[in-house]
């Protein structure tokens, strides 16, 4: 399994489509990651990725705090906001924006989890968009998610695989909006595949001089090293052995790895092991000793010390604190009224 797939598996993506919209110029909407809206569609999550697939027409988008981030999108292009940050999207981004909660206020009858359909704007040229988001566990500063641009677009019609995803998502969104059985489940899986394709396209488009995790994945030698570290995280790796596996000298691999990722291979491996440990602790099915053994620690005490260095508290306390946060998130899921999706009144 390649490093991209391995990291995507670790963050446990869970996708959803919440809106199919028909917008007519002039129009502008400010999108926020609303906790109540997310709770109606997604499981509890550490991070939410927002995306918008342009089905027809065109629009502009930019981060709310960065006018220089404005990009133009045409039909067939996908807008991704990996950090779920507040962003503007519209026929122009210098218009007074309508908040998402105002736009969705008319969706009072929609049950939580169902795809909403809205029409909005001034009656000019039409733009149709499918809007969704993905929840993902981001216990550690996940190398993939933290390497992506704050806002970027991907042309979904550049190859047959991406074009198939785009057409499938359009069809599934229309089915779900018509309340066809199973439509939302299909949309969830397509959303996840859409994000994977967006990540791969982002890697392919990197300039030659780029550094960071994505550039490391693309590099012939560092990418192979990352795949080995991810696939066999429990193995007692040394830089010498890793270098032999990828076909470089020890010094050449160490330098190349550090230049691209900003840290040496063994430091990266230690952090990746803590990512695996955090995922196991969140799952709650294994003892601390079992988790320690799974990631290659010979003693629970050594594991606890390493975990504290990474997360600022021992693993038992960290798991307990995360359990409390998750319980609060699940309670919030019962009251999605802030987004305009209100629960039914008591009978």
Task: Describe the residue ranges of each PLM region.
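Short helix-to-turn junction characteristic of helix-turn-helix DNA-binding domains
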Residues: 54, 229-232, 280-281
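A short, N-terminal "cap"/entry segment at the start of jelly-roll beta-barrel domains
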Residues: 1-30, 124-128, 142-160, 327-346
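Residue at a beta-strand N-cap/secondary-structure junction
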Residues: 60, 70, 236, 268, ...
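…primarily DNA-binding HTH/wHTH and HhH modules…
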Residues: 279, 286-287, 294, 301-347
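An amphipathic alpha-helical interaction segment
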Residues: 127-153, 157-228
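Residue-level recognition of short, solvent-exposed, well-ordered loop/turn junctions
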Residues: 74-75, 82
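Generic protein-terminus/edge-of-domain signal
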Residues: 1-71, 77, 88-118, 342
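Basic/polar phosphate-binding segments, predominantly the helix-turn-helix DNA-binding elements
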Residues: 193, 197-203, 224-275, 292-317, ...
């Amino acid at each position: 399994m390649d490093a991209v797939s391995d990291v995507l598996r670790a963050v446990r993506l869970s996708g959803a489509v919440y809106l199919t919209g028909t917008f007519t110029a002039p129009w502008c909407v400010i999108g926020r990651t609303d906790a109540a809206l997310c709770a109606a569609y997604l499981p509890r999550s550490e991070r939410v990725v927002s995306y918008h697939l342009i089905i027809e027409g065109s629009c502009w988008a930019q981060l709310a705090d960065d006018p220089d981030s404005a990009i133009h999108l045409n039909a067939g292009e996908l807008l991704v906001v990996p950090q779920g940050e507040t962003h503007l999207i519209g026929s122009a981004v210098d218009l007074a924006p309508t908040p998402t909660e105002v736009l969705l206020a008319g969706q009072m009858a929609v049950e939580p989890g169902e795809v909403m359909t809205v029409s909005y704007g001034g009656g000019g040229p039409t733009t149709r968009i499918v809007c969704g988001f993905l929840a993902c566990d981001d216990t550690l500063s996940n190398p993939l998610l933290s390497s992506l641009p704050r806002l970027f677009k991907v042309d979904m019609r550049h190859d047959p695989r991406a074009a198939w995803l785009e057409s499938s998502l359009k069809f599934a969104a229309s089915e779900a909006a018509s309340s066809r059985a199973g439509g939302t489940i299909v949309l969830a899986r397509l959303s996840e595949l859409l994000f994977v394709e967006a990540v791969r396209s982002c890697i392919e488009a990197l300039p030659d001089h780029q550094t960071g995790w994505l550039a490391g994945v693309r590099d012939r030698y560092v990418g192979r090293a990352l795949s080995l570290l991810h696939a066999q995280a429990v193995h007692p790796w040394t830089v010498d052995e890793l270098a032999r596996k990828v076909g470089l000298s020890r010094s050449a691999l160490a330098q190349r790895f550090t230049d691209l990722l900003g840290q040496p291979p063994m430091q990266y491996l230690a952090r990746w092991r803590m990512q695996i440990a955090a995922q196991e602790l969140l799952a709650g099915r294994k003892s601390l000793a079992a988790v320690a053994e799974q990631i290659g620690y010979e003693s629970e005490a050594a594991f606890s010390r390493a975990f504290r260095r990474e997360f600022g508290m021992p693993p038992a306390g960290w798991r307990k604190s995360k359990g409390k946060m998750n319980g609060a998130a699940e309670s919030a899921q019962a009251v999605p009224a802030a987004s305009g999706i209100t629960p039914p009144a008591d009978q």
